[in-house]
Amino acid sequence: MTILQRVKAAGGLPIRAALLAAMLGLLGAHEAAAQKWPDKGVRIVTPFAPGGGTDVFARILAQRFSEVFGQQFIVDNRPGAGSTTGTEFVARSPADGHTLLMTSASFTFNPGLYPKLRYDSLKDFAPVSQVVKVPHVVLVLPSLPVKNLQDLVRIAKAKPGEVFYASSGPGSALHLAGALFAIQTNTQLTHVPYKGGPAAATAVMSGEATVSFSTIETVLSLIQAKRLRPLAVSTRERTPALPDVPTVMEAGYKDYEVIGWFGLFAPSGTPPAVVDALSTEISRMMTTPAIRDRAAQEGATPVGNKPAEFERFLRSEIAKWTPIIQKTGIKVD
């Protein structure tokens, strides 16, 4: 007879006491681990190549965390397979707070894009905080006779399939932003994938593509230099970085909203005290003038929300995008 069987045979109270003791012991182990954290260097994995918005904000966090927590935080770029390579690496990493994930809206797209995804976006991660949000910008070449969104839609309807939109790759945020725009405006746009957001913007400037739905941090300097013309932004409110540019909703498409964002995650099972420490520091960072100014340079709006709020946002975004992806028929597997 096992110990558990003997306890059970003796009556119900001892087994409840034993289970309670086990739970308390587990909580104690988590608290002890959290008190020692970090006891070595911490890796912030970003599943994209260096230079993009995710990488930029991961490095901002790494520098601040190194100063605050007394250990070296480094950024580890692990691009590939539509961001799933680096994301899966973190999902399979020890849940001790020494491997973190900094990623983007692709995190909420991938459950719909990859039927054979080898991790669960909700079950395998502990959301820490949405760091910033960034709008997408509908962009064209300034020399085109397109002054506003209505002009673009008019041309697209007059020439079905002849308006080419550049994206940063199949299944990317830029791809989905364009696909949703085509649905909402009842137009037929032709998708042209490129290797990254900067390449998509270059395609518009060279005339290879008509339009792009780029994230603002990639193209803000090009807009300011008047090398690209912004027609609209994808969020509900105008962005402070481009206050004179209307939203897509203002142009009459009330259901169009695409929220770009960058956020921090830990593997599921990471001690709550570690998650809370990271989240609290991000919230504090997002209120400092230096960080707010740095975010503004990238066209981003600081968020710094708590884990529970971030999780609610993630669930709502997955619920929104999965049926949209199914409707468009986009597949990347």
Where in the sequence are the language-model features?
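Beta->alpha turn/N-cap motifs
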Residues: 102-107, 167, 197, 214-219, ...
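Sec/Tat signal peptide C-region and signal peptidase I cleavage site
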Residues: 28-34
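N-terminal secretory signal peptides that target proteins for export/translocation
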Residues: 1-12
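An extracytoplasmic/periplasmic, membrane-proximal ligand-sensing/linker region
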Residues: 39-41, 183-187, 250, 272-333
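Hinge/capping helix and adjacent helix->loop/strand transition within the periplasmic-binding protein
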Residues: 92-98, 112-199, 248-250, 261-294
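N-terminal (or domain-start) structured segment
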Residues: 34-123, 162-164, 186-213, 222, ...
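A ligand-binding cleft/hinge motif common to bilobed small-molecule-binding domains
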Residues: 107-116, 175, 180-184, 211-245, ...
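Bacterial N-terminal signal peptides
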Residues: 12-28
